[in-house]
Amino acid sequence: MRMPTGSELWPIAIFTIIFLLLVDLMHRRQRWTSRYPPGPVPWPVLGNLLQIDFQNMPAGFQKLRCRFGDLFSLQLAFESVVVLNGLPALREALVKYSEDTADRPPLHFNDQSGFGPRSQGVVLARYGPAWRQQRRFSVSTFRHFGLGKKSLEQWVTEEARCLCAAFADHSGFPFSPNTLLDKAVCNVIASLLFACRFEYNDPRFIRLLDLLKDTLEEESGFLPMLLNVFPMLLHIPGLLGKVFSGKKAFVAMLDELLTEHKVTWDPAQPPRDLTDAFLAEVEKAKGNPESSFNDENLRVVVADLFMAGMVTTSTTLTWALLFMILRPDVQCRVQQEIDEVIGQVRRPEMADQARMPFTNAVIHEVQRFADILPLGVPHKTSRDIEVQGFLIPKGTTLIINLSSVLKDETVWEKPLRFHPEHFLDAQGNFVKHEAFMPFSAGRRACLGEPLARMELFLFFTCLLQRFSFSVPAGQPRPSNYGVFGALTTPRPYQLCASPR
């Protein structure tokens, strides 16, 4: 067969470009209405991709909010996006239209790691029967294995004891706390998933944590966004393996852990953990092609719970200790409350929380100020809705700017300062604000919120009960400005943990 010459290819290329431009134009004309949210003028085909600051998206979105208002639109290639800002817009979209905004936009690069119609996990699953089935299963299994009961609290308290022992091993010398916090929180998730914990020096455990962090970094930023809006690029030979090498290794390691766990599973015995409970559901679902209980989805659910349950809580605790060394006055008040309510012998319990308003306020203020997931997880509309007078068509991706609520100067007295009094009334009682929504809101609010609250309170109080934290002598005062990435993390810092 004769190959076309260069002169023959030019008309084909020109026709293809014109065709793409026409498709792009027709796609956008559907949204050209006075009721559609305004936004920056997009470029042909690429849309606003090159106009977004992927290094600091919250700051970039704040500038666009000042220019266009609480709702503004973006075009990411052929994907229409609306960014929601401010409490009224977020509550209207996520609560009033809870079911209509509960869908997720597809992440095409996930298809290469076992993510598919019958294996969507929980966090990123499309809204429908499979998501309902998995969320219901996860919530009921968490409850069965102790969420809200004494058993899980004992797991967390025991892990807090191990964490304190690891802090004590540094003998008051400077160290970075984030790795130990990662290990402690990850062990709580491992207890729920595999009914076991890892030793902190276990090489396999260390590799699991490294791969988990690599996966999160690989899935954030400009390149993953580009691959998602132009999925045809995913077919370039070798590209996926290079861009998502950490994710590929992480999934392979999860497969190893699950294979080992299946060998020890006895269907005749009560389930030891979430994995056993899932395997039992897989057996029940055999012969049902519509069920979301299958081996591929087990891997995705486990990955979801590791990533959503570990990194967010450990990052929040890393911020909490940073604020304690930056604000020794706050640290002193927390320790005073611990001494009065718990003492220095008995271990903290969740029952203590109701009698510790200042400590509770500090934890909430850490979550508000740290703002670790400023843009939440994207939603997608399943039908036309109207928010703040603007029409948002079916199939539009929604970016939920949680930072616009957590740092709203019309709600918080000192939005850009660490100020625990945001959560205290004039009498010193704890009060919770409607604008406090680090776990999002509505139908897709974080299912691990109760577990995260338990971990934050027990780990934080156990550490402050045992140690006083300070900036190492001779080191500069750390910054309280975060680094935006998959999560907003503190800049690297060290502290000294002195036994009390």
Curated annotation (Swiss-Prot):
GO terms for molecular function: anandamide 11,12 epoxidase activity; anandamide 14,15 epoxidase activity; anandamide 8,9 epoxidase activity; arachidonate monooxygenase activity; heme binding; iron ion binding; monooxygenase activity; oxidoreductase activity. It is an enzyme of class 1 (oxidoreductase). It catalyses: an organic molecule + reduced [NADPH--hemoprotein reductase] + O2 = an alcohol + oxidized [NADPH--hemoprotein reductase] + H2O + H(+). GO terms for cellular component: cytoplasm; endoplasmic reticulum membrane; intracellular membrane-bounded organelle; mitochondrion. Keywords: Endoplasmic reticulum, Heme, Iron, Membrane, Metal-binding, Microsome, Monooxygenase, Oxidoreductase. GO terms for biological process: alkaloid catabolic process; alkaloid metabolic process; arachidonate metabolic process; C21-steroid hormone metabolic process; coumarin metabolic process; dopamine biosynthetic process; dopamine metabolic process; estrogen metabolic process. It is found in: Endoplasmic reticulum membrane; Microsome membrane. It is a peripheral membrane protein. Heme binds at C446. Brain. Its EC number is 1.14.14.1. Its main location: endoplasmic reticulum. InterPro entries: Cyt_P450, Cyt_P450_CS, Cyt_P450_E_grp-I, Cyt_P450_E_grp-I_CYP2D-like, Cyt_P450_sf, Cytochrome_P450_fam2. Its cofactor is heme. Belongs to the cytochrome P450 family. Cytochromes P450 are a group of heme-thiolate monooxygenases. In liver microsomes, this enzyme is involved in an NADPH-dependent electron transport pathway. It oxidizes a variety of structurally unrelated compounds, including steroids, fatty acids, and xenobiotics. This is Cytochrome P450 2D4. It comes from Rattus norvegicus.
